[in-house]
């Protein structure tokens, strides 16, 4: 389906309503994948080539104890990580940035504007529809984070950590209402594929 070498990508369950959709997209793309509790020790992730940090319930990214070992994964991973919604917000907080209640909480369809295609948005339109479901948003980016996309109500919809294959998305690419969602996952898997040969 994706033309990638065999790879293992686990989805870290942070209690999000669409965690199974993330797993299902990866399965559809012929990736060896499973959902794991966010309490899984990093040392038990033997042979994993990448992680997807799922979304979670409202404000969960601010409640560190409910995010399990996500911080450990970020500190120790030498492979790509994609944080979605609460996963993205946790990444921001973990590296010294900040999240805050959104000026305009986003639920449903919104228009995404790609500012920098980087690797994640290669080959995609500069503007397309995505699905949102968040009360909080990234308010302060840590040093070394690069904004990749925004919407009219949210100035940071996607980022990359410079020098690392770590990405964050505020919107939900796994939801069918997001245009090009599968393509975003495919582009992430291309990053994983290229990282595997290093």
What are these regions (language model features)?
Residues 8-10, 16-84, 95:
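Flexible gly/pro-rich beta->alpha loop and the following alpha-helix that scaffold active-site loops
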Residues 68-84, 89-183, 187-191:
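Pocket-forming structural segment of enzyme catalytic cores
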Residues 1-6:
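Short, Lys/Arg-enriched N-terminal segments with co-localized hydrophobic residues
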Residues 12-13, 171:
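Active-site flanking residues adjacent to catalytic metal/cofactor-binding acidic residues
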Residues 190-198:
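Generic C-terminal helix-cap and adjacent flexible tail
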